[in-house]
Amino acid sequence: MNNTLKVEIWSDVICPFCYIGKRKFESALKQFEANDNIEITWKSFQLAPDLKTDTSISIDEYLAIHKGFSIEKTREMNTYVTQIAKQEGLSFNFDRSIVANTLLAHQMLHFARTVGKQEVTKERLLKAYFTDGKNIDDKQTLIELATEIGLDIDKLNQALNSNDFVDEVKADIDEAQQLGVRGVPFFVFNRSHAISGAQPVEVFVETIQQVLKQTQEEIILSDDQVCDIDGNCD
């Protein structure tokens, strides 16, 4: 890659297709000889900003209650998503996932960005939620994850307790609305091309090639597997 590629990704930590889409995007990047000229910024998006964290019910039960599905239907849906994730080398354990608000996690991501560790933090938060069954709305849990990553615990604690990055989280969400984002993941390349959803790897490859060649100026939008603002993932 001779040109700098700036990628902004709107994503939520409890969005399964955001994790799947991350892997597909990463697979696409591997097909280029050099990717050190890539600047990736993870933007905040909350599928359920008013969600109340509840450790007493399962994800299946939550979806059944709030989406009007049967338990059998929600299990079927989550099994389907788990199979898709497995194809990308991911292990989803929805039976362990905790119903949790993601505001604290997004604040942590913004803090991590200030010290150049946003990428590793994003990966750890996604794994914590989908694989490890961690409560990502619990400050102590986030501190433990931060210790693994190597973040400054005292500074992170201060940031979380003082809500230092709430405005940044809200600004990301407002920006997404201005761009017309209706679901995540949503990838924007050099502010000229966009991909919505966990698209096939070849779609990411083709888009990156187009951006680097600067063949077009308008946004090209591809739409596939997404979690929308109503919390529906398909």
Task: Name these PLM-found stretches.
Residues 11-14, 18, 49, 70-71:
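Short, N-terminal intrinsically disordered low-complexity segments that are rich in Pro/Gly
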Residues 23-129, 232-233:
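Structural alpha/beta surface segment adjacent to cysteine/selenocysteine redox centers
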Residues 2-3, 7-11, 17-34, 110-234:
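C-terminal cap of thioredoxin/glutaredoxin-like
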